[in-house]
Amino acid sequence: MKQVGLRIDVDTFRGTRDGVPRLLDLLGQHGIQASFFFSVGPDNMGRHLWRLVKPKFLWKMLRSRAASLYGWDILLAGTAWPGRRIGAGNEAVIRAAAESHEVGLHAWDHYSWQAWSGVWPQERLALEVERGLLELERIIGRPVTCSAVAGWRADQRVVKAKESFDFLYNSDCRGTRPFLPQLGSGTFGTVQIPVTLPTWDEAVGTAVDIAGFNRYLLDCIHRDPGVPVYTIHAEVEGIAYADQFNELLTMAAEEEIQFCPLSQLLPADFSELPSGKVVRGELAGREGWLGREQLLTSGV
């Protein structure tokens, strides 16, 4: 069996309320455990509409048919009215996920992190993480041991800002395999587990059409020479394309692919991991900068 980390990002109120329960049902039917990363503060995702002036973002929204994919309640959330508190309004759903799956922090305010983390001082970065962490721990009633920043907006500043939270791992960037981020003076930070595979919205309309996506993704998994990690979104695979995701899980099992929580991808001895840095870069199918893996050593 080829092991693939399954990361589920939950960005919005509706994704939490409607998408997560559907995903829990599907994963239960297939006997799969995954890593859920929750946004728990205000749902202000509609404020991303200003990015429509950017050609790359406009094209992404058009080719992914964003209005029918996400729904207008998501696309307008937090614009004409204050964003609803995601965690406080969906505590039972989040606790249900935590009963059977690994649960980590995605963001306090997904929109704000994606829009402003690149210029925030380190103290503000740490404050945002702490605010979300305290809320998520209050909801599930136990320590949170992992995190994955919104939109992969991470660099070495973010790596350092998160060091005080003693996470087992972070999944803040795109890359090929788990690595130890190098800090100053020869020390290393919390393990990073990068996402290696394209997401639905990155691939559909550019590399493949909707009908061919499952086959495309499975072929990417078979070709992945590193440690495969796949990200889905509760707003996509948990709502509009839940049936397609169900088919993907069936096809994956038939092809000897086993999805698992990200923590199961870590070796027993972290000294075996390569060292590296999280640097800013770009990725086909995604607008703006994001964190990319830059390996410095190959590991054991």
Curated annotation (Swiss-Prot):
<dbReference type="InterPro" id="IPR011330">
    <property type="entry name" value="Glyco_hydro/deAcase_b/a-brl"/>
</dbReference>
<keyword id="KW-0448">Lipopolysaccharide biosynthesis</keyword>
<comment type="pathway">
    <text>Glycolipid biosynthesis; 4-amino-4-deoxy-alpha-L-arabinose undecaprenyl phosphate biosynthesis; 4-amino-4-deoxy-alpha-L-arabinose undecaprenyl phosphate from UDP-4-deoxy-4-formamido-beta-L-arabinose and undecaprenyl phosphate: step 2/2.</text>
</comment>
<protein>
    <recommendedName>
        <fullName>Probable 4-deoxy-4-formamido-L-arabinose-phosphoundecaprenol deformylase ArnD</fullName>
        <ecNumber>3.5.1.n3</ecNumber>
    </recommendedName>
</protein>
<keyword id="KW-0046">Antibiotic resistance</keyword>
<dbReference type="Pfam" id="PF01522">
    <property type="entry name" value="Polysacc_deac_1"/>
</dbReference>
<dbReference type="GO" id="GO:0016811">
    <property type="term" value="F:hydrolase activity, acting on carbon-nitrogen (but not peptide) bonds, in linear amides"/>
</dbReference>
<comment type="similarity">
    <text>Belongs to the polysaccharide deacetylase family. ArnD deformylase subfamily.</text>
</comment>
<dbReference type="InterPro" id="IPR050248">
    <property type="entry name" value="Polysacc_deacetylase_ArnD"/>
</dbReference>
<dbReference type="GO" id="GO:0046677">
    <property type="term" value="P:response to antibiotic"/>
</dbReference>
<dbReference type="GO" id="GO:0009245">
    <property type="term" value="P:lipid A biosynthetic process"/>
</dbReference>
<dbReference type="InterPro" id="IPR023557">
    <property type="entry name" value="ArnD"/>
</dbReference>
<dbReference type="GO" id="GO:0036108">
    <property type="term" value="P:4-amino-4-deoxy-alpha-L-arabinopyranosyl undecaprenyl phosphate biosynthetic process"/>
</dbReference>
<dbReference type="InterPro" id="IPR002509">
    <property type="entry name" value="NODB_dom"/>
</dbReference>
<keyword id="KW-0444">Lipid biosynthesis</keyword>
<dbReference type="GO" id="GO:0016020">
    <property type="term" value="C:membrane"/>
</dbReference>
<keyword id="KW-0441">Lipid A biosynthesis</keyword>
<keyword id="KW-0443">Lipid metabolism</keyword>
<feature type="domain" description="NodB homology">
    <location>
        <begin position="2"/>
        <end position="260"/>
    </location>
</feature>
<keyword id="KW-0378">Hydrolase</keyword>
<dbReference type="GO" id="GO:0009103">
    <property type="term" value="P:lipopolysaccharide biosynthetic process"/>
</dbReference>
<comment type="pathway">
    <text>Bacterial outer membrane biogenesis; lipopolysaccharide biosynthesis.</text>
</comment>
<comment type="function">
    <text>Catalyzes the deformylation of 4-deoxy-4-formamido-L-arabinose-phosphoundecaprenol to 4-amino-4-deoxy-L-arabinose-phosphoundecaprenol. The modified arabinose is attached to lipid A and is required for resistance to polymyxin and cationic antimicrobial peptides.</text>
</comment>
